[in-house]
């Protein structure tokens, strides 16, 4: 081990036990603080009876260890009028109330939407919400929202001061609901309402594995989603948003899906997530201790 402090090298005295104990305790506390500021996990598949996930309504894990968001019959067929959600158990610290720091995050997942017809419904979403979030209505609301905040035309679709609708989502919408959707299937970003504030047309492929990556940059305050099928051009949609003004300090992340009279199988095949608050500049006294470690 090389120590950079010249005076310390010249004394050639070992660190005293009290100082070593202090440094050890300091590093342990530092680790604990950092661990609450960041979170990462990876599911290459979804083992049965996973204790890391919260299942709501019809969500389940299949015998093939895929995450099925909506109800599937014993014969493998999707059911009508189904709502299901799955959330990661450990909450994510999205921002720090005491410092105003905002987290960056990135999530990547692969999925397949499979329908017995070419008219599926209704879609699924990756979403961020308060830790005590509960399922919303099915059909076009994707299990995310209740009918009262379907649309707020006076504020571009955002439900103003609606504490029960603290949700940011990236939706993969397969069914066109005329009252709140563009006239095509789309990937959209929703903020407190099922009416997407940003969206792009999406060519759904029946039963084909797709990949999505969603990221948030706190410096630019930009939320970006990139979606692709094999051998196709990736689709990108982004939105400028200060998540600190929309969501609480602690949140949960997960998936939500629904069917109506039209049906589909919403399968999440793999999922990874990582988040971290912006690192603060080290204090002068911390730098002094670090010289001796």
From Swiss-Prot:
Binding site for Mn(2+): 171, 173, 181, 186
Tagged with keyword Manganese: yes
Keywords: Calcium, Glycoprotein, Lectin, Manganese, Mannose-binding, Metal-binding, Signal
Glycosylation sites: 64, 152, 162
Record bears the keyword Glycoprotein: yes
Amino-acid positions noted as binding Ca(2+) in the UniProt annotation, renumbered to this chain: 173, 175, 177, 181
Sequence intervals crossing the membrane: none
InterPro entries, sorted: ConA-like_dom_sf, L-lectin, Lectin_LegA_CS, Lectin_legB_Mn/Ca_BS, Legume_lectin_dom, Leguminous_Lectin
Signal peptide: 1-35
Highest taxon listed in the record's lineage: Eukaryota
GO molecular function: D-mannose binding; metal ion binding
Matching PANTHER family: CONCANAVALIN A-LIKE LECTIN FAMILY PROTEIN, LEGUME LECTIN DOMAIN-CONTAINING PROTEIN
Extra remark beyond the main annotation: Binds one manganese (or another transition metal) ion and one calcium ion. The metal ions are essential for the saccharide-binding and cell-agglutinating activities.
Entry's family note: Belongs to the leguminous lectin family.
SUBUNIT field: Homotetramer of four 32 kDa monomers which are post-translationally cleaved into a two subunits: A and B.
Purpose of the protein: Mannose/glucose binding bark lectin. Bark lectins are storage proteins that probably maintain stocks of nitrogen during dormant period. Self-aggregatable molecules that can bind their own carbohydrate side chains. They could also play a role in the plant's defense against phytophagous invertebrates or herbivorous higher animals.
Protein name (database record): Agglutinin-1
Annotated source species: Cladrastis kentukea
């Amino acid at each position: 081990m090389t120590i950079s402090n010249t005076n310390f090298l010249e004394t050639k005295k070992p660190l005293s036990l009290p100082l070593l104990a202090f440094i050890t305790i300091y590093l342990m506390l530092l680790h604990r603080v950092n661990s609450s500021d960041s979170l990462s996990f990876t599911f290459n598949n979804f083992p049965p009876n996973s204790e890391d996930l919260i299942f709501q309504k019809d969500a389940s894990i299949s015998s093939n260890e895929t995450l099925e968001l909506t109800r599937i019959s014993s014969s493998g067929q999707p059911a009508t009028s189904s709502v299901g959600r799955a959330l990661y158990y450990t909450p994510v610290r999205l921002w720090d109330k005491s410092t105003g720091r905002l987290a960056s995050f990135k999530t990547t997942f692969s999925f397949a939407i499979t329908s017995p017809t070419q008219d599926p419904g209704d879609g699924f979403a990756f979403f961020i919400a308060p830790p005590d979030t509960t399922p919303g209505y099915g059909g076009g609301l994707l299990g995310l929202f209740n009918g009262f905040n379907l649309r707020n035309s006076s504020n571009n679709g955002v439900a103003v001061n609606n504490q029960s609708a603290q949700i940011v989502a990236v939706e993969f919408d397969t069914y066109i609901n005329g009252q709140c959707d563009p006239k095509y299937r789309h990937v959209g970003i929703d903020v407190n309402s099922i009416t997407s504030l940003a969206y792009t047309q999406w060519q759904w492929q029946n039963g084909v594995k797709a990949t999505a990556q969603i990221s948030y940059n706190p410096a630019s305050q930009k939320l970006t989603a990139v979606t692709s099928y094999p051998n196709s051009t990736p689709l990108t949609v982004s939105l400028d948003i200060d998540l600190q003004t929309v969501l609480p300090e602690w949140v949960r992340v997960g998936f939500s899906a629904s069917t109506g009279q039209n049906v589909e199988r919403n399968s999440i095949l793999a999922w990874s997530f990582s988040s971290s608050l912006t690192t603060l500049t080290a204090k002068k006294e911390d730098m002094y201790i670090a010289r001796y470690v």
